[in-house]
């Protein structure tokens, strides 16, 4: 039997679940909250962008950052969740991972996942399911896991010992 780790996330919160087998129920392992995700961007930083001096002359113009403060806070949160996922992965013996998030956030997770964890991602559900009741979430995740071909999950199985009994 293959146990799965299921990460259900949005910009504000993430929940890590254990799914002991394809037919069992989700068990909550760890919760994460991003307080910056709940606040408007104006509350996270100053109201005006920085100023930059021109090379010659006395002209100045506003400096536009590459990412907004809100996007930066989201990436910091994603890195925090991934660090916890790595710690969990080191202790659970190589369980496959199911990622559940909105498409844009799923891309952020993909971008920041280290190679060792990317190899263990067995399925992705491109929906924001964080607000669903646990029973409905359980149903959706189990449907996705049951739809996986056995060849996908067999590479994560731990070999059984055969010996004299």
Residue spans of the language-model regions?
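Terminal alpha-helical anchor/extension segments at protein ends
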Residues: 1-165
